[in-house]
Design a protein with these regions (language model features):
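Conserved glycine-rich cofactor-binding loop
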Residues: 11-12
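The beta1-alpha1 cofactor-binding region of Rossmann-like NAD(H)/NADP(H)-dependent oxidoreductases
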Residues: 44-55, 87
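A short, exposed helix-loop element centered on a Lys and neighboring polar residues
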Residues: 105-106, 148
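Active-site helix of classical SDR
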Residues: 105, 139-142
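Substrate-binding pocket helix/loop in short-chain dehydrogenase/reductase
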Residues: 81-82, 86-91
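SDR active-site lid
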Residues: 156-225
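Residue(s) in the substrate-gating loop at a strand-loop-helix junction
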Residues: 123
Length: 261
């Protein structure tokens, strides 16, 4: 049966691949992003703009009568020293990555019924934070926790909710990540070392289509688990960390990403 699927950030990377997979499946896909496209099924707005999001989702819901699947994929990354990051950039990241998720969910729920699904794209970094990526990790951690709460809150309505935590994926996400390289004598070269460590994994990252295909198959399940980790390495790591003291885990991660000055 044809489904109405709404994807934020659906014009690039994982979002675009998901759009293509659902369209190939015969579903009607509506995308929301800041890009301006000549496509009647695309809506150009920032998910951080609450009023615009409500207008777009209302238009979709009124036209089709219902929304079967909402995928909150819009977001961007940031790295830098927390002490030195511009607060406006931090607020902008939280507005897009976290508040944008809330805005779309609040607007869409009234068009969603029993059997519909909300899929929030979080990140493996919500589970395994690394130095100098704390703002992004905390935003994705908030998305993960929100998903857990909504799974309970919406269960009586028959709405399935899950969070997807992908590991390293080869998209323009890393290239487009806001990178603040300002440092001082308190941090020395640690930021540079951590950035180099992260960027050095580029060739080892999972392809976007591979990640999207795994997510697509998950969404096709009738019942959804509270969250899914994409990437065997990260699933194994998650299992191992359940039996590892948090202080030990943080110390190991810190050493891998620059450690001390």
């Amino acid at each position: 049966m044809n489904k109405v699927v709404v994807i934020t950030g659906g014009t690039s990377g994982i979002g675009l691949d998901l759009k293509n997979l659902f369209e190939k499946n015969g579903d009607t896909v509506l995308t929301i992003s800041t890009r301006a496209l000549d496509n009647p099924n695309h809506f150009s707005c920032s998910v951080s703009d609450e009023k615009s999001v409500k207008q777009v989702v209302d238009e979709i819901g009124q036209k089709y009568g219902h929304i079967d699947i909402l995928i909150n994929n819009a977001g961007f990354g940031m790295s830098g020293i927390c002490e030195l990051l511009p607060t406006e950039q931090i607020k902008n990241l939280m507005d897009v990555n976290y508040m944008g998720t809330i805005y779309t969910i609040q607007s869409a729920i009234k068009f969603m019924g029993k059997g519909s699904k909300i899929v929030n794209i979080s990140s493996a970094m919500a589970l395994f934070p690394v130095p100098f990526r704390g703002i992004y990790a905390s935003a994705k951690s908030a998305v993960l926790t929100l998903s857990f709460e909504l799974k309970m809150e919406l269960q009586p309505l028959g709405i399935e909710v899950t969070a997807i935590c992908p590991g390293d994926v080869k998209t323009n996400f890393t290239k487009n990540r806001i990178k603040e390289f300002e440092t001082n004598n308190r941090y020395g070269e640690r930021l540079q070392k951590a950035t180099e460590k992260s960027d050095s994994r580029e060739d080892k990252r999972m392809s976007s289509i591979s990640c999207a295909t795994k997510i697509f198959k998950i969404i096709c399940h009738k019942k959804l688990k509270p969250f899914y980790i994409i990437g065997a390495k990260y699933r194994l790591l998650y299992f191992a960390t359940r039996f590892t003291p948090k202080s030990m885990l943080l110390n190991i991660t810190n050493k891998l990403y620059g450690g001390t000055k």
